[in-house]
Every structure is written in C-alpha cells, then in structure tokens.
C-alpha cells in the first residue's frame, strides 16, 4: 500500500526523447527512462504548501479517484468532489464561506456573471449564486458530465458521457438544442471530450472516434471527420479539442494527435502514438494544452509529449506505471501534469525535465489549476491542496 503522507520531491527518473537520442549521463538516468519513478537527487523547490482542505473522508476506500478541479475568482476558491458537497473557500486560508450539496462533481465549475455553472456525475447542470450558494436552476441531461461547460453570451453548452452535446439558455436554463453522437456497442474508455467554442462553431468528439463541428445557433453539423485510424474499438475522442489560428487540434485513443482545418475538417497532419515496448497500450490522451507555439499531450502509458504545431516531437517523458494522465497545464516556463497513480509533476516545458514532484500518497487524477501564483490540486483521497507556486 502506498504511504498516505504527502511527499514533495525534486527531479525524477524521467528522460526526455532528446536524452534518448544522446545526452551526457546523469544520476536521473539510473531509472527506467520511460517510468514515472522518482529518484534522487532532489531538484528545484517550486511549490510550498499554503493550506489544504478535506472535501470528503475517503481514508477507508481502496484506490479512490477524484477528478474535480477548483475554480478561483478574486478571493474565493470553488470546488466540488465525488462526495456530492460543493464548497466556496477563502483563497487566503481555505476556510469555508458556504457549502451546498449538488451531487458528485468530476470537473471544474465555471464562474460567469455572478453565477456558477457546475456539471455533475448524475447528468445535471446545476447553477448556483456564487455569493450565497443558492440554487438558481438546473437542467437534467442523460449522462454524467465530466467536463466543464462553456458559457457564451447567450448559451451554456456542455457534453456528457452519453455522447450528447446540449445547449441551454444561460440565464433561464431553457433547452435550446441537442446533438447526439453514435455510441459504439463495444466497451469504451472512461471519460469524454468537452466542447471548444470558436466563433459560430462548436468542436467536440465522441466515443466512436468522430470529431464534429456543430453550428452554435442550431446544433446542426458543419462537418464531421473520423479520427479512428484503422481501429475497431477503443477509438474514443476523450480530450477536448484546441483551436489555434485556422486549425483545430484533436486526438483519439487509436489514431493519435490530429491537426485539421477548422472550417472544413480536412486532416492536415496526424501523429500516431505507439511504443514497441508497450503494444497493448491504449494511448488514450488525457488532455491537450497549448501556448500557441507548441502542443503538450499526455497519453496513457506512453508519457507526456511536446509537439510543434506541424506535428514534430520536441520531447517526450515517460509515464509507465504512473496511471492515467490528466490534461496538462502551462504556467510561465513550467508544465504541470498529474498521473492517477503517481502524483503531480512540475517540468520545464521547453525540455520536459522534471523539476519537482508531489505525491499525496494516493495519486492525483484531477487536472491541476493555477490562479495567479497559486496552484490548486485535488488528491484521490478528496483533499484539495493549495500551494504557493514559484
């Protein structure tokens, strides 16, 4: 059993692709180059604990997982958890402002216009007053909502694990339209893609390996493109697409990462993920992030990659034995990412070199969140950690 006490450590035994091609021997190379495995020596101190808050008592559970993420506005931190309780906390101390039972949460709430838009595991979009926690309205969909909704000037758009995209009025919650993707009869991977809104189009993907662009006003299909490659199962598009310039970047567990023309869906390039040492790896992408110049991709079993916008690999660090990845986060020169069975990694985003590592004892499945110079991350035991980030 893993220890329950958190550990903060420095550089890990993770070697990037550049080192695999030849670099000076160092003590960090004593470990398996592709394993998520910390070893000495310690590296740089980039985080210090500010406070922590227990959202749920999960000490007696075997291998629990928490996917909820925080959202921060001014001096308040908002967060839910699998326990069903939702909290507003003082950012300075972690003290409770108010709490409300809304149902299990596996994503970040979206603050907008004095309201909080929250997706729940029972398929409800719940809207609360951000100051008081009073419920304004809720809309019930037919599948668990595991990605944050997107709030526009007049609509709230969200997706769920039933391969649905739903748009409702942002003020009243009145139904506007719904699009249903085809769900395969075979088993699919856990999770689903969120929605990316760009102008008048909404981009998302489904468990059948299809990426679609929907018209925002009607939900009708502008185009659809298969990202399945040659796979017959486990072809899920579970990472939320990213729009940069005239391209949309997306991924599937069977096809790797794609760049497509955002207006037509035409594939510009594709980078498949595969490792000869791991022929059974799903390669399911936990998330995409970009600084506008590079893409950062976390793929199950295979590691975290940095790509340029033409699909060339800049570096790679391994994740074998680390568990499922969450979406990476960019902060200044750093890249932050978490692995479900290992913890939180803080790396130099230019090289992939890990600078610091935080292991709460039970791994981290949730995406980290950065607000200003504060880092917030939820452990699998339901503890929200607030760090000062340097």
Region locations from a protein language model:
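Structural signature of WD-repeat beta-propellers
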Residues: 81, 120, 160-161, 206, ...
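Extracytoplasmic beta-rich repeat domains
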Residues: 26-35, 42-71, 96-112, 135-152, ...
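Blade-level signature of beta-propeller repeat domains, shared across WD40, Kelch, NHL, RCC1
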Residues: 360-390
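Loop/turn-rich, solvent-exposed surfaces of beta-rich toroidal or solenoidal domains
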Residues: 294-305, 309, 316-346
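Short loop/turn segments that connect beta-strands within beta-propeller blades
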Residues: 90-93, 129-132, 169-172, 215-219, ...
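C-terminal motif of bacterial Sec signal peptides marking the signal peptidase cleavage site
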Residues: 20-22
